[in-house]
UniProtKB/Swiss-Prot annotation:
It comes from Dictyostelium discoideum (Social amoeba). GO terms for cellular component: cytosolic large ribosomal subunit; extracellular matrix. Gene3D superfamilies: 3.30.1330.30. PROSITE patterns: RIBOSOMAL_L30E_1, RIBOSOMAL_L30E_2. This is Large ribosomal subunit protein eL30. Transmembrane segments: none annotated.
Length: 112
C-alpha cells in the first residue's frame, strides 16, 4: 500500500513537470484536438483526468494504441489537472507533442 504522503509528493512532482511543459513545450488541451494529434501521429504522451467518461477514455486509448503513444492516467480529476497546468478551467485530456525543457516523457516512460 502506498502512503498518502508519497502519492501527494509524486502528484506535486508531475504537476511541476506539467507546468514546465506548458511554459516551454508544445501541447494540446481537450478531447478533439488530442484526437487530431493522435491521428496525425504527433503525440508523445497523453494525460487523462480520472473522471473522464469511459467511452471517451476507451476511444483515446484505442487511437493511442494505433499510434503507439503512452497514455497516463492523472490521479486527480479534471479540475486538478487544469489547475496543475496553470489554467482556470477544467482539462480532461492533454496531449504533449513536445516536452520542451521538462523531463516528463522519461519520468512517465513515454516515447521520446
Amino acid at each position: 500500500m502506498v502512503s498518502v504522503k508519497k502519492v501527494k509528493k509524486s502528484q506535486e512532482n508531475i504537476g511541476s513537470k506539467l507546468a514546465l511543459v506548458m511554459k516551454s513545450g508544445k501541447s494540446q488541451l481537450g478531447y478533439k484536438s488530442t484526437l487530431k494529434t493522435l491521428r496525425a501521429g504527433k503525440s508523445k504522451l497523453i494525460l487523462l483526468a480520472s473522471n473522464l467518461p469511459s467511452i471517451r477514455r476507451s476511444e483515446i486509448e484505442y487511437y493511442a494504441m494505433l499510434s503507439k503513444t503512452t497514455v497516463h492516467l492523472y490521479s486527480g480529476n479534471n479540475v486538478d489537472l487544469g489547475t496543475a497546468l496553470g489554467r482556470h478551467y477544467r482539462v480532461s485530456v492533454m496531449s504533449i507533442t513536445d516536452a520542451g525543457d521538462s523531463d516528463i516523457l522519461t519520468a512517465l516512460n513515454a516515447k521520446a
